[in-house]
Amino acid sequence: LVPFKPHTFTWQFRKINYDLMLLNTLDSVDRIIIADAPGWRRGSSMSALETPPIQQILAEKRADKPLTTQYAAVMVPYMTEKSPVVSARLLENDFRTGAMAVEVRFENRTDYIISTRDQQLRTYGPVTAAGQFAVVSVNNQGGVLQAYLLAGTELACGQAKITLAAPQTTLRVASVTERTFRLIEPILPDMAPVGAYLLANGPEPLRKGLPSPRTGFEIESATAVSITVRDYPVFDCDEVTLLHSKHVKLEQ
């Protein structure tokens, strides 16, 4: 498919419907490919080889020189006949800065989702934010239902305002054990709350001049000198970066 306009792809599995709304158009995608991938991953038996294929949606962009492409898609699972999403559109897709913003409309509210790579103050619709990630839900009368800011310092929309002293804090690591980072210096009691996120520096990059890859973890618990994360064991690293965040929910 040639994406002259945004496309919506719909699947149905048993009683569950699923929409994939690809918001990119020809300015950032040359073509959309619908393909069946093998349903098996290791052909250890004939029954494995007979596993039904997995349908995939591929967005493709080509150029003779290095390029940057940013994709935006809204994924909507639902069990009703009609999707709860009325419309979705891409408000910003700046390849130079990496800033992206999406507006998703429902019958009774509108969500604004903002992703950036810096702390520049930007405005999309009724939302002004400085941070790497922000989400705001607004009702049909313009009242803010809830707002969330991650790794940022400021978010404002109507009567809702969030301010953080700093977007992130870097902590030096003394050692690691299973799912726990042990810190060189103590932290304040509320600096690493349950459910917050941190980034851990990975191995050296494959090419010089590139940043080290980082892995994100969700915090399960913390003491003054340690942070334990959920689900996965941690790896040796010299430092971790706490991503500060705040969520507010307003009564309507």
Set out the residue ranges of the language-model regions.
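Trp/Gly-enriched beta-strand surface patches
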Residues: L1-I54
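Non-catalytic terminal regions with compositionally biased, polar/charged low complexity
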Residues: Q56-A72, V76-Q252
